[in-house]
Amino acid sequence: MPDDFNLKSFLADLPHLPGVYRHLDAAGEVMYVGKARDLKKRVSSYFQKNLASPRIAQMVAKVASVDVTVTRSEAEALLLENNLIKSLRPRYNILFRDDKSYPYLLITGHAWPRIAYYRGATSKRGQYFGPYPNSWAVRETIQILQKVFRLRTCEDTVFANRSRPCLLHQIGRCSAPCVGVIEAGDYAHDVQRAVRFLNGEAREVMDEIEARMLQASTELRFEEAAVLRDQMGSLSKVLHQQTMENVGGDDTDVIAVASAGGKICVNLAMVRGGRHLGDKPFFPTHAEGEQPAQVLEAFVAQHYADGAMPPVLVCSHALPDSGLVGLLAEQGGTRAARVLTRPQGVRRSWLEQAQKNAEMALARALTESGARAGRTLALAEALDLDTDEESLDALRIECFDISHTAGEATQASCVVFLHHDMQPSLYRRYNIVGITPGDDYAAMRQVLTRRFGKVADGEAPMPGLVLIDGGKGQVEVARQVFVELGLDIQSLVGVAKGEGRKVGLETLVFADGRPPVALGKESAALMLIAQVRDEAHRFAITGMRARRAKTRNVSRLEEIEGIGARRRQRLLARFGGLSGVSSASIEDLASVEGISQELAVRIYDALHG
């Protein structure tokens, strides 16, 4: 520790109050963030002789100072801790990927509700069901609701402008409320039954449909009875195919932890309304040497900090901090979940299955990790880079690519490879402006100057390898930029396409004068380079297309004779965007105010020509 940091005096002055502490190294970088019910006791515990975790012992040896923040409560400390972990990503905290928000199934608040896949803040009017572990689980549930209850999935703009039933009605997946095939009351009943099904009342819904079918048959309403019979048949198939269990109606998350080969997997399974919706594996970083219970606690703290916790958590290990779930509930303004570590009955089988899935996901990850690390090693050996384990893990590769269509909407992409894998959160796109359309050299000069100008100013990290998608010309442009910025040109490598642009025939071109190298199509190093190069190309293409579409969307309609700003606005408002206008029939187009039959034909031909 530095001489100006008096540890003994610092610890003596700490209060017996809740708060957050941060361990900093000699460079002032935050290495670890934690919360405490009692700051004095918790921070002092790090400086005892015997620490259970080798990782934490290694961190403590590097501590140069400690910052503390006193909070009004332990719940407030938990919130601050999670915010700091997310923003700082300290290298000694167990970290879970801050994933996209989970998807939900939404039944809208429209007079004729639609069912929809939804991801984002749950602020729209309607009923939300979930969260689901993945998009596939939501879409499967939507298909079930279409089969059984025949609820609509079309956008409101399409619903409001249909003149005849769509294909979904013809195949029995929609009751066509858009054109009045079903009465409002009957459709509302179908929606209510769908809600009850999603809430775990599938058996009760089945009994109700059967009773209504028998009544309709008795009253000689055979057509209605046939519809109800088909509903019952579809629901019966679902009940046989799905695992539907009656466990008190409480939604449940099942969390299992598996460890092997120095890696840990946390597997989260979700049960909603008695239906097992599937599971999702998580692989934390900085968890080497940690006990499964500690990793489980970190997962619970980070995963439920921003999201709703279900009434029941079934866990493979007991949480070291028994008060954590209560703090999360207090923070979110909800009731604390029941935590079960020795479940019985069906919950026990859920946990056993989650544990098996965690172990299988971990085995797959270890196999893939070994293969990825092997490719990184092969590349390092081919390019004469450091090959020790730490250097390979820290090897950062950035690849740049330029994309445009005949000079329009030129965009550069930068993708990043780090820790033996692509890192999408570090990808960047650059809009290229002020150059002659189609001048790829000028575009490359601009993006490299913008990106590595920050490196020269000490504001961004310098990668160990910079890949340029191109041959001698592009590499020479990159070399000039690096020389102007005072950067080492040895890290610059161009990937020149082979004869016929065939994969495996690429040649590596070096900026420092080394002779070109052809690694061969069987080379693991070339496989890695091709993966990074192709990802840069994909990322650039998607960005360019989005930018081009954005600039074209407005102009495509206004280019049609007879369409001005006012008519364009009416069309976009009626059909919800250009794609809706493109999907509309001539009759639908002609129903818009100010659009004649002749103009509707002209619009249709222009968008479909």
UniProtKB/Swiss-Prot annotation:
Domain named GIY-YIG: residues: 16-94
Listed GO MF terms: DNA binding; excinuclease ABC activity
Alphabetized Gene3D superfamilies for the sequence: 5' to 3' exonuclease, C-terminal subdomain (1.10.150.20), GIY-YIG endonuclease (3.40.1440.10), UVR domain (4.10.860.10), UvrC, RNAse H endonuclease domain (3.30.420.340)
Keywords for this protein: Cytoplasm, DNA damage, DNA excision, DNA repair, Excision nuclease, SOS response
Pfam families: GIY-YIG, HHH_5, UVR, UvrC_RNaseH, UvrC_RNaseH_dom
GO cellular component: cytoplasm; excinuclease repair complex
SUPFAM superfamilies: C-terminal UvrC-binding domain of UvrB (SSF46600), GIY-YIG endonuclease (SSF82771), RuvA domain 2-like (SSF47781)
Subcellular location(s) of the protein: Cytoplasm
PROSITE patterns: GIY_YIG, UVR, UVRC
Role description: The UvrABC repair system catalyzes the recognition and processing of DNA lesions. UvrC both incises the 5' and 3' sides of the lesion. The N-terminal half is responsible for the 3' incision and the C-terminal half is responsible for the 5' incision.
Family statement drawn from the similarity comment of this UniProt entry: Belongs to the UvrC family.
Subunit structure and binding partners: Interacts with UvrB in an incision complex.
NCBIfam families assigned to the protein according to its UniProt record, in alphabetical order: PRK00558.1-5, uvrC
Matching HAMAP family: UvrC
Name listed for the protein in its UniProt record: UvrABC system protein C
Species per Swiss-Prot/TrEMBL record: Bordetella parapertussis (strain 12822 / ATCC BAA-587 / NCTC 13253)
